[in-house]
Amino acid sequence: MEEQGTGIRVEAMTAEYAQQARAWAERLGLPLQDDTAAFAVQVGVDGLQIQQLGPQAPGPVRVDFVEGQAAHRRQFGGGNGQMIAKAVGIAQGIRPQVLDATAGLGKDAFVLASLGCQMTLIERQPLIAALLEDGLARARADEEVGPIVGRMRLLTGNAIERMRAWEGEAPQVIYLDPMFPHRDKSALVKKEMRVFRPLVGDDLDAPALLEAALALASHRVVVKRPRKAPIIDGPKPSHSLEGKSSRYDIYPKKALKA
């Protein structure tokens, strides 16, 4: 029996998706065959998903804006009263243009888009960006969710470089949610985290990310952190909004107006 490695392969869930699997493999620069792979990018009826391989692996990770958690939060999440809405400055007559520079699976960006914000997303990890692109494409076909994801524009690449080289109108608000180095096993409970860490790693460049965001944003920068985590090295936030498990550090530059 071959030992499991750290590689990633692409596979079709059924024969009818073989052509799409080949296209994704070519685009991502990944093999279709690797018996020692630790992860599989799977293409099937539910779109694109990443499956960690091995006996203790959690279920697949995919982006779904139409059903499940995203739909529940859209319908019952608390609307403009949500802490994230307050953090980015949503108020009566105010829907800021927001750059989510650490998009991940797009969950927070989708919440803000569902509340009416025009969103630009940056994701640096090509596999995560592929999941996000696939999820956005599927959501566009949905009558109810299509208009929401129509407010979400995805960019790929290094967010620090993207922000430093930004052209055109600056985003009013930049939202950062850096991957925080884990201290205990409880941080690995969520399957997304178990899959993400080996692929993405921690955001050790968070201070540079904050610096670039503060230089670009016209009105404010918001940083999401674990509740007890230290602030990112650099300027101090003016204030924070604290929840049960998360905290939003707010760095204002100029007041948002209706």
UniProtKB/Swiss-Prot annotation:
Name of the protein described by the UniProt record: Ribosomal RNA small subunit methyltransferase J
Keywords carried by this UniProt record: Cytoplasm, Methyltransferase, rRNA processing, S-adenosyl-L-methionine, Transferase
Compositionally biased residues, Basic and acidic residues: 239-252
Gene3D superfamilies attached to this UniProt entry: Vaccinia Virus protein VP39 (3.40.50.150)
Entry's EC annotation: 2.1.1.242
GO cellular component: cytoplasm
Protein family (similarity comment): Belongs to the methyltransferase superfamily. RsmJ family.
Localization per Swiss-Prot or TrEMBL: Cytoplasm
InterPro entries: 16SrRNA_methylTrfase_J (IPR007536), SAM-dependent_MTases_sf (IPR029063)
Region (Disordered): 232-258
Binding sites annotated in the UniProt record for S-adenosyl-L-methionine: 123-124, 177
Gene Ontology MF terms in the entry: rRNA (guanine-N2-)-methyltransferase activity
A family per Pfam: SAM_MT
Chief localisation class: cytoplasm
Domain of life, per lineage: Bacteria
Catalytic activity annotation: guanosine(1516) in 16S rRNA + S-adenosyl-L-methionine = N(2)-methylguanosine(1516) in 16S rRNA + S-adenosyl-L-homocysteine + H(+)
Physiological role: Specifically methylates the guanosine in position 1516 of 16S rRNA.
